[in-house]
Amino acid sequence: MAEIIALDDVHDAGILIKKILSKKGHNVHTFTEEEEAISYARTNKVDLAILDIKLKKMSGIDVLAQMKKALPAIRAIMLTGYPTVETAREAISLGANEYCIKPIDKDELEEKVSKVLRG
């Protein structure tokens, strides 16, 4: 199916995303460090990036902007535990296709991943 990156500064959140989406047949690569995820996206095929907005060194929106430079066609879903209209607007304006509110809901994540990958 799809090659997916999951970037969250909380290791368990990445593991949860991997468990949910691997059952749907996707290959999920989890990261807790922004630079590692960006580097991976530059050198590997990635269909979808699932990025937490609040990270350690930079925001998920900054990470998305860097990934878009390397892979303009990459699709993205932003994760946030602090949803605001501003954050949603900024994420969408930078090319995020969707966003999910944490804690992650399995059905919502599966539905949004499916929708974004269909284009």
Residues covered by each model-derived region:
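Acidic, metal-coordinating helix/loop segments flanking the phosphotransfer/catalytic sites
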Residues: T30-L48
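Short amphipathic alpha-helix used as the core "switch/output" element in two-component signaling
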Residues: I61-A73
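C-terminal output helix
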Residues: E86, I104-V113
